[in-house]
Structure formats: C-alpha cells, structure tokens
C-alpha cells in the first residue's frame, strides 16, 4: 500500500504539468540538439548512446556548452525515441514530463526507503517522508523544467547510493556495497554535483 500511495500521490499532484512547454535551457539541450534525434531503432540508439559517453559536445547544439552528462543525454534521447514509438512527435513535451514525473515518484519511494532504513521500528515515518518529498513545492522545478531532469536523475542515484549503503550496514553483503558504487557512478554520469 505504501508504494501505491506514493505513486498515486505523485500522479495526482503532478499530472497537471504534462502540457507545460519547453523553456530556458531546453532549447539548446533538447529541442535544437540534433544529437538526440534518434529513431526507436536499437542500432541507432546504441550508436547514439555510445557517442554520449565519448563526446561531451553531444550535450547541446552549442558545442561550447558541452558537459559530460551521458546518462542524462541518453534519457533525453530515449524520450525522443519513445515519443516516436508511441506515434507522437519526438519533441512532444508530454512524453518528457511523464518521465520527469516517474523519476520524481521513484525519488519519493527512495526517500521512503531511506527513512525506513534510518528508523526501522517506525515504518510510517517512511510514508510521511516520501509524501512530503513528493508534494514539496520546491520539487516543481525538476518536474516542470525538462532540463532540470539533471537534478532529479542525479538525486535518484544519490538517494539510491545512500539507501544501499544503509542497507549494507545491516545485511553485510558485499554485493550491496558494490551496488552503492554503481549507483554513485551512475549519479556522476548524470551530473557531477552528485559528489
């Protein structure tokens, strides 16, 4: 019931943002970025994603604004290809907002898990923490502003890193510790502020 409650709350609170348009950095990093224009074809996606990991200039149409954020750029390209696969325009903003809302929901679930790991005897604290995170007005930027996905996706991996570390303290399995490092690495490949 906790997962369903948090997912439902996210949808109810943020569904109204689906038709919000692109703005600010969305123009150079998404709308005019030819590197994101991938068809829903596995070969083309593979080549595109490979280029995001080897060429920071793929971050923007303006090579001077290049940043090394391959997982973020991959998520934008995936959005473009998924929009096409669903019969939408590749740059239909609704597809981008659906992914941002999904990332926000996952972050709420991770906050819940993290709180439950901190206070294992008080399970309701996790639900409350997750709901507060999901509903907090400051969370509107990463949901409404597509380019701010860098913040929410980096937060996803950061929260996952912290939760896995706490989980590793109790289960003492080496693979949980290694999963911490993988999550941290994914965060760094999304945005360097994950450090």
Residue ranges and their predicted role:
Residues 1-195:
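Polytopic membrane enzymes that build or remodel cell-surface glycoconjugates and lipids
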């Amino acid at each position: 019931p906790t997962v369903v409650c948090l997912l439902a709350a996210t949808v109810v609170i943020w569904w109204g943002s689906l038709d919000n348009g692109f703005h600010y950095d969305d123009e150079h990093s998404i709308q005019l970025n030819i590197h994101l224009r991938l068809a829903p074809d596995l070969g083309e996606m593979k080549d595109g994603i490979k280029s995001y990991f080897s060429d920071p200039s793929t971050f923007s149409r303006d090579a001077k604004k290049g940043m090394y954020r391959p997982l973020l750029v991959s998520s934008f390209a995936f959005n473009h290809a998924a929009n096409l696969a669903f019969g939408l325009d590749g740059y239909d903003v609704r597809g981008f907002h659906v992914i941002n809302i999904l990332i926000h929901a996952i972050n709420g679930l991770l906050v819940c898990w993290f709180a439950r790991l901190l206070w294992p005897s008080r399970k309701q604290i996790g639900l409350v923490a997750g709901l507060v995170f999901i509903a907090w007005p400051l969370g509107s930027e990463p949901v409404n502003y597509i380019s701010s996905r860098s913040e929410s996706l980096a937060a996803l991996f950061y929260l996952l890193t912290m939760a896995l570390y706490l989980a590793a303290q109790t289960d003492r399995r080496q693979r949980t510790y290694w999963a911490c490092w993988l999550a941290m690495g994914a965060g760094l490949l999304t945005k360097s502020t994950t450090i």
